[in-house]
Amino acid sequence: MKIMISGGGTGGHIYPALALIETLKKRHPDLQVQYIGTENGLEADLVPRAGVPFKSIQIAGLKRSLSLENVKTAYWFLKAVRALKKDMAAFKPDVVIGTGGFVSGPVVYTAQQLGIPTILHEQNSIPGLTNKFLSKKADRVALSFKGSDVHFPGANVRLIGNPRGSEVLQTEVDEASVREQYRLDDRPIVLVYGGSRGAEAINRAVVEAIPSLSELPINVLYVTGKVHFDAVSKQAPSSDNVHIHPYVYDMPSLLACTSLVISRAGASTISELTALGLPSILVPSPYVTADHQTKNASALVENGAALLVKEEALTGVTLVEAIRQALEQRDEMANASRALGFPDASDALADLVEEVIQ
């Protein structure tokens, strides 16, 4: 089996693709993969690190407002399509899979022009422009949230969940080694992170909250994002139980040892939380398309699996209050979170791949 797969920009588009690749490798030891991304996206780091063949193209996302930048984007899109036609003629993929981000646009579009079967995976409750555009000719559109089908009229949609959740469940974890790696004692771990790029608002609130967090019987593992690490390290007061890191590469292992998560409400994060049955405090990013992170979070909040703190209300004080409340309700929230998960999402997406090839 040969697959070409594309998704990039943030971990939310990349991790589901990598999880699918691992599942297909187990089923098809002779699997050949070509991953297409951009050289400046996070995929240029994560994909080769996972041992997956990677090739970059130059492309940019469309601006939603009128902009001369869109002329340049159209040029790069057409140039990428010409190059991808040659790549696909040489590689001969059985199927092309797009997991979102603007880089997947020319890849899936080219496959559709060549008559190669295509599958889209939409991680968010509200789709981005790329997947909405491509869905009209896609053979299958795999969804992560109930109710998202209304955004894909006429498409062949399947509700499967997010493969990232399956990946974290399958990770074998030695908790003692994880705690030793991050220098954590046996107190419950509260993980704070703002997604693959970090989040300034969360960083500010945590720095403000550190004196109060130091008094709680917990370990706080605080992941700033690489861009923010130096600034946060200088601002943060010292604390024996607050441990600051720029990035975590093996998030599944860390999550498996965690008692409470404080994070944005990106799609991969939601899938990880529900797969593992983790309670959470969600701070949706107000800067994303159509406020989709708030809608991602709503399913958890409405079912008692998470607490919601709007970014404009996030301070050190409100953060500590939410942590205290979540720790008191941890068992109930964990059970509610687990009930919302799709533990077999990666297998379900692999089934779709095999289905369209047959």
Curated annotation (Swiss-Prot):
Record-listed UDP-N-acetyl-alpha-D-glucosamine binding positions: 10-12, 124, 196, 293
Annotated signal peptide: none
UniProt keyword annotation of ATP-binding present: no
Membrane topology according to the record: Peripheral membrane protein
A single GO molecular function term of this UniProt record: undecaprenyldiphospho-muramoylpentapeptide beta-N-acetylglucosaminyltransferase activity
EC identifiers of the protein: 2.4.1.227
GO biological process, one term: carbohydrate metabolic process
InterPro entries per UniProt: GlcNAc_MurG (IPR006009), Glyco_trans_28_C (IPR007235), GlycoTrans_28_N (IPR004276)
Origin: domain of life: Bacteria
Functional pathway: Cell wall biogenesis; peptidoglycan biosynthesis
Subcellular location: Cell membrane
Keywords (A to Z) from UniProt: Cell cycle, Cell division, Cell membrane, Cell shape, Cell wall biogenesis/degradation, Glycosyltransferase, Membrane, Peptidoglycan synthesis, Transferase
The family this protein is said to belong to: Belongs to the glycosyltransferase 28 family. MurG subfamily.
Protein name, per record: UDP-N-acetylglucosamine--N-acetylmuramyl-(pentapeptide) pyrophosphoryl-undecaprenol N-acetylglucosamine transferase
Organism name: Exiguobacterium sp. (strain ATCC BAA-1283 / AT1b)
